[in-house]
Amino acid sequence: MKILHFAPEKGLATLFAELTPEGYDPVDLAPDGYRFLKVRQFDVVTDMETLATGTYDLILHSHIVEHLPISLAHFFFHVFRALKEDGVHVFAAPLMPGHYDEYLGPLSKEDATKRFGQWDHVRWLGVEDFDRHLGALMRLEKDFDLTKIFSKRELRACNIPASQQMGLHGSTVFMTTKNDYRLAGDYEMPHTPSPDPIRESRKRRKFLRWW
């Protein structure tokens, strides 16, 4: 089993490393910050194209997309490209009140904090226009409800507060497959007949005389 794990969390990393020692691929921009695990250095901005196509059974990441100074379309294109046909992509992101906002240019820590809520964030993932950012890239289940999967007793045992058990928020977990990617397939441009050069020349001369 092949697993690609961006910015691996200790609990999950320990589990996956035991589950598939040879197939677990934890990656991060700053791997030296991990003391509990050997992590491969990986820059999402420059390295996404290096991921082998159709390689991973599972790709997961939690709260990283708000940090990425690159197009979300670029990131998710390569995530789904690297996924196997029957693979699964699991992720969470800080879904917030309001509308989507993004700025990939230089910004001071103070301005970034004021605009996005945190100095190292480059986008605000608003729930009001969810279908126009994350929802435009892939089919996502907006009726998130952990109570349909786990009992209240299990949720309490995992210390998941009631406010985070359903709906769109920072704790919402999305699970997608290749079929959920909305931009899949080869895009074919609509056929547009080539313009008649003589007719176009006459139109231009007529316009220039008028001008």
What are these regions (language model features)?
Residues T53, R199-R202:
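Basic, mixed-charge low-complexity alpha-helical segments
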Residues L19, L51, D111-K114, W119, ...:
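Alpha-helical structural elements
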